[in-house]
């Protein structure tokens, strides 16, 4: 998906975050995998998410019943190849104690803010100065929202591609349908990025699938028939979307049967790189909620 320079901001899982106290300080600092520090954020109803300061990866999002709505591989190790996901997930992010105000941001019951500034070491990898701010928030209905802001702090123009990599927990991949991408063009990653048009009503899974859908709508639905729920993905500022499942193909950081329990629907901006002039800022919003399958679109209430 573009050259290595353009992949600077691609992440694994759900991206990077930084911690800031909310009104009732609903977070806990503790140790996670490999002794790395992680932050657990809770809202007044007991819903939560957790993030690692190294790489800032969101590794858990739980509803009030304690059910995790994100997928975590049994072999997760917070590592991965740079060319696929950029270097920001291999950096320690800092707490943004005084972030600039966010316009048109969904209201939240708990949130944290992170910041990452390019270092001298980073400039040797990608020679452009930037400031990346990220807010991760829980909404009143339990929805999870990630708001990314990237500012060009350099004296020259630069361009980049961008992507989040959420893996959603599902009952059984063979029972999953992805809706909202019908009649769109996509690049098939398993066929040398050959371009096709999807004429199906929805996407189902019976083998390995890796597609980059182009110019996608702002809402995509993942229907889990066994659990009778629908995961609703909403996005702004990310025109494309990746749909992926490894099926039974060997992947370094996946267990043998892990493929059955997740689906990746990833908001990305890769077909047309983002261009920022000095001082300009780009913003993207990613929001995910869970609703009962079959409810009317006007009356659906997230039950995360």
Where do the model's predicted regions map?
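Asparagine-centered strand-capping/turn motif at beta-strand->loop junctions
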Residues: 51, 138, 148-154, 290
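Beta-strand-rich N-terminal accessory domains
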Residues: 2-76, 216-239, 280-302
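Extended, loop-rich substrate-binding clefts of extracytoplasmic carbohydrate-active enzymes
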Residues: 33, 82-141
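Short, basic/aromatic beta-hairpin or loop at an interaction surface
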Residues: 253-264
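Plant-skewed but cross-kingdom recognition/interaction modules and surfaces
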Residues: 97, 235-253
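Active-site/ligand-binding surface loops and adjacent short beta/alpha elements
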Residues: 157-159, 163-241
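Intrinsically disordered, low-complexity Pro/Gly/Ser/Thr-rich segments with frequent PxxP/GP/PP motifs
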Residues: 270-283
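Hydrophobic core residues within well-ordered beta-strands of beta-rich domains
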Residues: 132, 144-146, 282
């Amino acid at each position: 998906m573009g050259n290595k320079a353009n992949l600077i901001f691609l992440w694994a899982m759900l991206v990077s975050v930084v911690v800031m106290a909310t009104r009732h300080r609903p977070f806990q600092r503790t140790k996670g995998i490999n002794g790395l520090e992680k932050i657990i954020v809770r809202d007044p109803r007991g819903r939560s998410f957790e993030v690692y300061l190294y790489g800032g990866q969101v590794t858990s999002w739980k509803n009030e019943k304690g059910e995790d709505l994100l997928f975590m591989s049994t072999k997760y190790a917070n590592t991965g190849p740079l060319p696929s996901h950029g270097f920001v997930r291999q950096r320690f992010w800092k707490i943004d104690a005084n972030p600039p105000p966010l316009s048109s941001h969904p209201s939240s019951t708990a949130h944290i803010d992170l910041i990452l500034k390019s270092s001298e070491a980073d400039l040797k990898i990608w020679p452009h100065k930037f400031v990346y701010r990220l807010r991760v928030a829980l909404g009143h209905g339990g929805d999870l929202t990630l708001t990314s802001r990237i500012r060009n702090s350099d004296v020259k123009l630069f361009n980049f591609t961008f992507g989040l990599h959420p893996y959603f927990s599902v009952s059984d991949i063979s029972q999953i349908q992805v809706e909202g991408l019908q009649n769109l063009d996509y690049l098939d990653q398993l066929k040398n990025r050959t371009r096709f048009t999807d004429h199906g009503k929805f996407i189902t899974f019976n083998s390995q699938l890796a597609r980059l859908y182009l110019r996608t709508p702002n809402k995509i639905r993942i229907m889990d028939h066994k659990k009778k729920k629908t995961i609703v993905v909403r996005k702004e500022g990310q025109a494309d979307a990746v749909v992926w499942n490894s099926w039974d193909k060997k992947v370094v950081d996946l267990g043998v049967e892990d493929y059955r329990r997740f689906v990746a629907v990833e908001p990305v901006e890769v077909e047309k790189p983002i261009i920022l002039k000095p001082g300009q800022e780009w913003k993207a919003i990613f929001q995910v909620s869970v609703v009962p399958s079959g409810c009317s679109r006007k009356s659906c209430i997230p039950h995360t």
